[in-house]
Design a protein with these regions (language model features):
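Bacterial N-terminal signal peptides that target proteins for export
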Residues: 2-12
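N-terminal signal peptide c-region/cleavage motif recognized by signal peptidases
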Residues: 20-23
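A short helix->beta-strand "capping" segment at the edge of beta-propeller domains
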Residues: 27-42, 150-154, 348-354
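Signature of short aromatic-glycine-proline-rich micro-motifs recurring in repeat-based ectodomains
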Residues: 42-48, 99-109, 164-175, 274-289, ...
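Surface loops at the rim/top face of extracytoplasmic beta-rich domains
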Residues: 51, 55-75, 100, 113-331, ...
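Loop/turn-rich, solvent-exposed surfaces of beta-rich toroidal or solenoidal domains
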Residues: 329-402
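Conserved blade-ending motifs and adjacent loop-strand segments that build the rim/top face
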Residues: 401-425
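Blade-level signature of beta-propeller repeat domains, shared across WD40, Kelch, NHL, RCC1
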Residues: 421-447
């Protein structure tokens, strides 16, 4: 395996057209480069990069697990500081299940991390579980007296039952409103036969207003939060959980509260719908992000057999249905093959980007670029798990029905192994988590001073 020592190594991306006009090729500088930040093998299975707003310049890398395929292993958060991975992990989480898509899969720093030292992690826990598969667990941690090491013990905020080791979602971010957003997959069974993605609670399926099961046959375990993005106030606890707080026991304390603007927040109006839900209709919103400039949400939702999609939610909106398992991309979903056209119904919102399978297979949601490379600013960058191609949406126009995009190269033309996620630095620089090589990369260009070259 190729390794890198002492210096960063850069690979120029080979620019190729996917589906876009010639004029749109100008969205990226001609010398756009991926610069390797640390040597190959620095991480076991990197899945994302985060940066606290504390002025330290450090990067925190989510290392999903040590032993992929193990039902009881460890995962960690590691720090890149001054261009090197610190020998001691920031946090090591024991008893992590890492089969399929499981592991340590989400990290979010509190907006006030610089003063309160609090952060949140999502992982799949081995051992006792509520549902058929390992629970998804949201835990609150704090930093120790050593800024590079966290306290090992945290407080569980929420446990969510699951039915399989895939479609775990698991991404978490604080929105511009200060609330925590958490993405959930639909449980992993092909086609979502239980209707989890369209079920908002005990009373109905939003899609067709008929009674919903929302649990596997005969199990008695409910999976109301699967196929959703939920929104929580993790700064305020609840003394006595309301009946519609689906991840808590009614009447018992909870480590979170419900933001009043959530679509089903009112227990009087929605006694049987889950107050935690922010939006729904997802298959596996594996990676999502907020535009740091205006708070808009960009969601990569992994498709079933035929299409991948990027969803968009304006900052001012709530309660949107992104239509899985009614639709896959712009098409009506069917286990026998999708058909053209999917009419939005029951508040349904179509995606902004759709692309077909072959050789692509699973979208990896990215970020709207707000970093130092001026030509990239305002462009949405994302990837695909099967090809590791880097895609850039050509100046997303939120009011447009669809967005165009280009590809900046695909394996073997880029140095990327397997793209698993992205992350922003505090300065807006964009990073790529490369599971294939156990490293991370940064988008760079000679057209900015930060990379050591004077621009024209």
């Amino acid at each position: 395996m190729l390794t890198w020592k002492h210096i960063f190594h850069s690979f120029a991306l080979l620019l190729g057209v996917l589906v876009v006009s010639t004029a749109a090729l100008a969205i990226a500088p001609s010398d756009l480069t991926l610069t390797q930040v640390v040597p190959n093998g620095s991480f076991n299975h990197p899945i994302g990069i985060r940066a606290p707003n504390d002025g330290s310049g450090r990067l925190f890398v989510i290392d999903r697990c040590v032993s992929e395929g193990s039902s009881a292993t460890t995962g960690s958060i590691k720090i890149v500081k001054n261009g090197a991975v610190l020998a001691t992990p920031f946090l090591t989480i024991p008893n992590v299940a890492c089969v399929g898509e499981q592991g340590v899969i989400g990290l979010a720093f509190d907006p006030n991390y610089a003063t309160n030292g609090t952060f949140y992690v999502v992982y799949t826990a081995s051992g006792a579980k509520i549902g058929a598969s390992e629970d998804q667990v949201l835990t609150r941690y704090t930093v120790s007296a050593n800024a590079d090491v966290a306290n090992a013990t945290g407080t569980v905020v929420m446990r969510v039952p699951d039915i399989a080791n895939n479609h775990n979602g698991g991404d978490i971010h604080f929105g511009p409103d200060g609330f925590l957003y958490w993405s959930m997959g639909d449980g992993g069974v092909q086609g979502d036969p239980n209707g989890f993605a369209q079920c908002t609670g005990r009373s109905s399926k939003i899609a067709n207003n008929t009674p919903a099961i929302c649990h596997t046959s005969g199990s008695g375990v409910t999976y109301y939060l699967l196929g959703k993005i939920i929104r929580l106030d993790v700064h305020t606890t609840t003394a006595s959980a309301a009946a519609n707080m689906c991840a808590s026991t009614p009447g018992q304390p909870a480590q979170y509260s419900i933001p009043p603007g959530n679509p089903f927040a009112s227990v009087a109006t929605f006694p049987n719908d889950c107050a935690e839900i922010f939006n729904w209709g997802f298959r596996n919103p594996f990676r999502f992000s907020f535009d740091r400039s205006n708070g808009d949400m960009y969601i990569g939702d992994v498709g079933q057999n035929t299409y991948e999609e990027i969803d968009y939610q304006p900052a001012a909106s709530v309660g949107q249905n992104f239509q899985w398992n009614l639709c896959e991309g712009f098409h009506t979903y069917s286990s026998n093959g999708d058909t053209a056209g999917c009419t939005p119904a029951f508040g349904g919102v179509p995606p902004k980007i759709e692309y077909p399978h072959g050789p692509t297979c699973a979208v990896v949601g990215g970020y709207l670029y707000r970093g130092p490379i001026q030509q990239l600013r305002g462009q949405y960058i994302f990837s695909d798990y099967c090809t590791s191609a880097i895609y850039i949406s050509a100046s997303p126009a939120p009011a447009s029905a669809t967005w165009t995009y280009v590809t900046l190269g695909s394996a073997p033309f880029t140095p990327l192994g397997v793209v698993y996620g992205f992350g922003e630095g505090a300065d807006g620089n964009l990073y790529v988590a490369d599971d294939g090589h156990g490293t991370i990369w940064r988008f760079t260009s000679g057209f900015i001073f930060q990379d050591g070259f004077e621009g024209p």
